[in-house]
Amino acid sequence: MSDWLPHSLPERVDINGLTFVPLTPALVEPDYAAVKRDIPMLRAWSGDDWPTEKFPIESNLEDLVRHDREQTERVALTYSVLLDAMVQGCIYVQPLLESFDERELENLSAAADVGDIVVRGWLHDRPAIDLIAACMSWLGNEPFEFSRLWWQTNANCTDQLAACEELRLRRVLSVRGDDQTWEMRA
């Protein structure tokens, strides 16, 4: 599904004190510093053992090259989140039904529409509600025309779940993975 994005994507978005810029290889060093800053939080967020304690900057560069390619090919949106011009987080945006493997989709496809979009992300130094509210506001308006936005999280990210409740994102889709259950909120 390559037609889910507007023709022109913003190079910078400032909203609620957060700055979003495309996640590109040019940001490898500041992104790496943000990733290495709180490994336990990112493992809880990612739902696996990423990043490892010995996660090398070369692997981070490979990730950024892949994310940049995904954005260029219109497979996903990937933005760094900056606070005071420093990388402090990331968001990942893609069509909901394309973000899970076929095994997981059996439970999802009946409850989700083809145009539904899922957003997930992490941020240091600000409450989760700030990131989620900014993303839902920005991506829920022009130039985007998504039928529905879902925020993806899991039980390990209690701050994100609480933020979803506070923002009244109470429609819930759950997808059981190998080790945990992913929860989407709209």
Label for each model-derived stretch:
Residues 126-131:
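Glycine-rich phosphate-binding loop
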